[in-house]
C-alpha cells in the first residue's frame, strides 16, 4: 500500500473575524509555514510523538493507530498561527487518503472544530466559516497576490482560553457584522484596498476584547507608508502587515522604522511570507515508509 503525504499551511491569524446574528465567522489565509504528515504501513519502528489534538481528532475516524507515520511542522504554537488546525488537518488528510482514497476538506475541517475552534486554512479558496462547527458561510475564487510581514512576540498564549466574541461584553459584535459584507464587496470588486481596510477594522474592533501592544502605532506606520493594512490573530498574539507585490519596495523602510520603535523588543521575531492558496494538499509518496 502506497504511503500518503498531507500538508496544510498555517496562517497569520485571521484576515477578519466577526459576529453576525449571534454567529461567529472568520477567514484565514495560508502562509509559508506548514504541518506535514506521512502515513503508510506499520514498520515496527518507534514512531514520533503526535501532538494531543492530533490524537484526539484522529479518534474521530479510527480507534486504533494501525499505520506508520511521520510528522513535521515549522509552525510555532501558542501564537495564533493556526498550528492546531494545520496539524489536525494534516493527519486527517493523510489518513483519509491512505485508508479511503478520498479527502473532503469541509468534512475534515468540521471534525477539527469538534476538538477546538478552527480556522479555514484547509481550503485552497478563501473561505469564510464558523470556527465552532466548520460550517462554510461564503467562498471566493479571487486570489490576490499578497504578502504579509509577520510580527511575532516571544510570549506564548493559550489561544483557546479567551472568551468567545459572542460571549465577551468587551467585543462590539454589532459593529463587527458589516465586516462580512465589506469583505464580500472587496472580493467581488477584487479591490485590495477595501480588503486591507476590512482587516484593519477587524483588528481594531478585536483590540477592545484582546488588546495587542502597539497596535495603533503599527497601523499609523502602515498608513504613513501607504501599505495595505493590518490583520491580527484574534485569539492569539501575532500581527500581520499586509502588502501588495508593488509595496515590497517599502520593506527596507518598514523594517527600519519598526526596529527603532519600542515595539521591536516586544515583536522580536519578524519575517515576510507570501500569502498562499495551497490549502490541504495530499499526494502519494513514492517510497513506502521504512
List each model region and its residues:
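ATP-binding N-lobe of GHMP and related small-molecule kinases
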Residues: 1-79, 278, 290
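Short beta-strand scaffold segments in enzyme catalytic cores
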Residues: 12-18, 35-40, 121, 126-129, ...
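DPxDG-like acidic metal-binding loop motif
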Residues: 79-105, 121
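ATP-dependent small-molecule kinase catalytic core of the GHMP/sugar-kinase superfamily
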Residues: 103-228, 244-290
Amino acid at each position: 500500500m502506497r504511503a500518503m503525504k498531507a500538508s496544510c499551511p498555517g496562517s497569520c491569524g485571521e484576515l477578519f473575524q466577526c459576529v453576525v446574528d449571534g454567529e461567529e465567522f472568520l477567514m484565514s489565509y495560508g502562509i509559508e509555514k506548514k504541518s506535514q504528515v506521512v502515513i503508510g504501513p506499520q514498520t515496527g519502528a518507534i514512531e514520533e510523538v503526535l501532538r494531543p489534538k492530533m490524537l484526539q481528532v484522529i479518534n474521530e475516524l479510527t480507534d486504533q493507530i494501525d499505520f506508520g507515520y511521520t510528522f513535521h511542522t515549522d509552525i510555532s504554537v501558542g501564537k495564533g498561527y493556526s498550528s492546531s488546525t494545520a496539524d489536525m488537518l494534516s493527519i486527517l488528510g493523510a489518513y483519509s487518503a491512505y485508508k479511503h482514497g478520498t479527502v473532503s476538506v469541509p468534512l475534515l475541517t468540521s471534525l477539527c472544530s469538534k476538538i477546538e475552534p478552527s480556522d479555514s486554512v484547509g481550503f485552497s479558496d478563501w473561505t469564510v466559516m464558523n470556527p465552532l462547527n466548520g460550517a462554510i458561510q461564503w467562498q471566493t475564487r479571487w486570489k490576490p497576490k499578497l504578502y504579509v510581514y509577520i510580527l511575532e512576540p516571544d510570549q506564548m498564549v493559550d489561544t483557546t482560553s479567551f472568551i468567545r466574541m459572542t460571549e465577551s461584553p468587551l467585543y462590539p459584535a454589532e459593529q463587527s457584522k458589516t465586516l462580512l459584507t465589506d469583505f464580500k464587496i472587496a472580493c467581488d470588486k477584487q479591490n485590495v484596498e477595501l480588503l486591507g481596510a476590512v482587516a484593519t477594522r477587524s483588528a481594531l474592533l478585536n483590540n477592545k476584547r484582546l488588546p495587542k501592544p502597539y497596535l495603533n502605532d503599527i497601523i499609523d506606520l502602515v498608513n504613513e507608508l501607504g501599505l495595505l493594512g493590518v490583520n491580527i490573530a484574534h485569539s492569539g498574539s501575532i500581527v500581520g502587515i499586509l502588502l501588495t507585490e508593488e509595496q515590497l519596495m517599502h520593506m527596507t523602510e518598514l523594517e527600519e522604522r519598526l526596529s527603532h520603535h519600542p515595539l521591536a523588543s516586544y515583536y522580536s521575531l519578524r519575517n515576510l511570507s507570501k500569502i498562499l492558496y495551497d490549502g490541504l494538499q495530499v499526494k502519494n509518496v513514492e517510497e513506502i515508509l521504512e
